[in-house]
Amino acid sequence: MNFFAQQRKYFLLAALFSLFSLSVQATTDDAKAAALAKQNACLGCHAVDKKIVGPSFQAVAKKYATDPAASVFLKNKILKGGSGSWGVVPMPANAKLSDADLSLFTGWILRGAPSTN
């Protein structure tokens, strides 16, 4: 095997390993975000794919899909709560989430709350 063929083989293996690692990380992050939704009582008002009291996570993702400030807006809404974005029923504040968890959670919502099954 010549040098370039061997290098190409190693490059392809490294690329495949990187893609697999990203997939595993995304699945782990999705599971953690789903657990945060459950632990913080978000699922009392929200579901992944249907409106309960508040909008579904998928509806939120769709509404803000093209908004570059969506992540900051959602983080603020989760931390401070409020009303007016989706109706008259106010969302309670949830100020106990860490910055890291808040970033993970809002990212998951904006991706449409992918399933961890």
Residue ranges with predicted function:
Residues 2-13:
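Bacterial N-terminal signal peptides that target proteins for export
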Residues 39-40, 47:
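Aromatic-flanked redox-active Cys/Sec active sites in thiol-based oxidoreductases
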Residues 63-73:
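Short microdomains enriched in Cys/His and/or Lys/Arg
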Residues 110-116:
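Short, low-complexity, Pro/Ser/Thr/Gly-rich segments in the mature regions of secreted, periplasmic
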Residues 11-21:
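Bacterial N-terminal signal peptides
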Residues 44, 50-64, 77-104, 117:
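Axial heme c-ligation environment in periplasmic c-type cytochrome domains
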Residues 3-4, 30-32, 46, 69-71, ...:
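Periplasmic c-type cytochrome electron-transfer domains
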Residues 22-37, 52, 63:
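Electrostatic cytochrome c docking/interface patches
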